[in-house]
Amino acid sequence: MIAVKSPLFKLGVIVSTPGALRALQEADQSPWEFLSRHVAGDWGVVCDEDRQANDESVKDGSRILSAYLLKDGTKIWIITEAEDDNGNRACSTILLPENY
């Protein structure tokens, strides 16, 4: 089990594309491994500019994008949508970059 000490933001509804689920299964990895990193502010393999943008997004409620490499080298993204007018994030999506 992977525990998150203090989430930086709410994920909303968690969804995934079939391709991302297949890639995770083939790599024998759980989506929770990456969701827990995402919600804790470990943005994975993003550039410094995207890392800084994500840090700001936690504060201002805009969209958050993380990228992670699976054991087999496949890259997955996790995108958490921007907050609505009530401060709620609707969903977080796990996907392959080519599914964007």
State where each predicted segment sits.
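Short, compact, well-ordered microdomains
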Residues: 59, 64-100
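Compact soluble domain cores
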Residues: 2-65
